[in-house]
Amino acid sequence: QALVATISAFILKGVIPAEPAVAAKSGGRSLKEIVRQPGFLKTVFSGAVAYMVMNFLMTAAPLSMHMHGISQQASNLGIQWHVIAMYGPGFFTGRLINRFGALRISATGLLITAGSVLAGLCGTDIFHYWLSLILLGVGWNFGFTGASAKIIDYHRPEEKTQVQSLNDFVVFGVMIVGSFSSGALLNLYGWNAVLWGSLIPVGIAFLCILKRSHKTVVVKHE
């Protein structure tokens, strides 16, 4: 914990938050019109899935480790590496998005998340949990950041507030559902059921991205 705190303090040293820009209060399309754009809902859905599955598995993993006789210390360390994996790639995720595109990075994140599930299905040793959690963190970073970056293509500056508010509402609403349901599913059916259950939304979200990968929707910022 001390090492993580020290690294965080070093990174944030001297960082001064910029003054928030004042969004335009006039003009812009209705939220209904924005939502009806081809691909918008699929983009929101893929971002919500990336966040929900991350929280779903992260919540259940420590409980499952305890159920399989793994120490609390090992469980805590696994979560710490998971958090590092979540935010560590943030130093270069933006560059990857600029180079390869938001959709590709989001799809890559979902594939890494699927890899996290497969790692968990391989066994219940410490290594399996840690590998699963680390992959889960990286998958979340790519999947959620890519989807969030793609959302920008669907709104103009004066529409930013309402679009981001809707996106956040959906993402965090779904995340809460996943967080509360993971413990119950783990208790009733076990760790493997939690893992298999995670693959379904990940697969659907990945297919949604594949269908959008050959189309580009760009809003002209007039």
Label the predicted regions:
Residues R104-A119, L199:
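Structural signature of the two symmetry-related core transmembrane helices
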Residues Q1-P20, C208-S213:
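C-terminal membrane-cytosol helix-exit motif in multi-pass small-molecule transporters
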Residues R36-L57, I134:
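Pair of pore-lining "gating" transmembrane helices in MFS-fold secondary transporters
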Residues T59-G78:
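Short amphipathic helix-loop junctions that connect adjacent transmembrane helices
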Residues P89-A102, L186:
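Helix-to-loop junctions at the C-terminal end of transmembrane segments
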Residues F142-R156:
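Intracellular juxtamembrane helix-capping segments at the cytosolic ends
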Residues G14-V44:
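Juxtamembrane intracellular "pre-TM" segments in multi-pass secondary transporters
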